[in-house]
Each structure stands twice: as C-alpha cells, then as structure tokens.
Amino acid sequence: MNITGVDFICVPTRDWEKSKDFYGETLGLERSKRWGQMPASEFETGSLTIALMQADAFGIEFRPHSLPIALHVDDVQAAREELEGKGVKFPTDTIDSGVCHMAHFHDPDGNQLMLHSRYAPPGATPAEAAGGAGA
C-alpha cells in the first residue's frame, strides 16, 4: 500500500445550514460540492478539503472536534480582526510559540479551529527562529 495524501477531513455538524453559512460566508471558503440532497458539503482550503456532515443524517452521534484544525493564513492578527468583526469569539489571546502564531476559535457547533501562520522554517527551534544558537 502507498498512501499518497489526505483527500478530505470530516467535520461533524448538528445544524448543517448554519455551519455551511459559517464556513462559506464567515470564513470565506469556496464550497465545491454538495453531497446530493444530504446535509453535507465540501469546502476548499487550498490544500485540504473540509467535508461538513450533519452527523445524525449519517447515523453518527454528534461530537465536536476537540483538537483544532489549523487554517493557514498569512497574517493571524489581521484574519482574527476580520473574524472578530463578523462576530467570531476567540477564547484566548493570539499565541506566539516561537515559530508560529496561532489563534483558536470555534465553529457554530463547537468544533475547534485555529488561524495559523508559521514564520520559521519547518523543524526550526524557537531559538533558531529568533536567530539564536544554531541559527
């Protein structure tokens, strides 16, 4: 077997109508397809497809994602301010890890999402990112 990538991730919803509006209008993601008449559709992020699925329509118990899906943006602060202007709440301040900026928030069903921007090369330590030892 040779797995060559991830085709899509599923995000469970309780209210597909509300969620599709959030992902499409609030986040500005392109809706690429609807799954027939099922309460499910796909949104494109540029590198990964997010499939929103109303859990009960597929016989699945609804449980929101407890770990965030990291959505890449060029400027976390600017993206955060844009979303705050649309009513999105952020439970914490923006985090600077030493290699990236992150801002956590939730979709209408409580799934965790994150705005993310890496400013250091992958694999760099915080010291290397800051120009310290080993840089």
What do the predicted segments below correspond to?
Residues 50-52, 115:
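Generic preference for hydrophobic
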Residues 35-37, 65, 97:
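Residues that act as N-cap/strand-start positions at coil-to-secondary-structure junctions
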Residues 1-2, 5-14, 41-44, 60-135:
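Vicinal oxygen chelate
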Residues 58-62, 121-124:
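A short local loop/turn or secondary-structure capping micro-motif enriched for an aromatic residue
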Residues 10-50:
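Core segments of cupin and vicinal oxygen chelate
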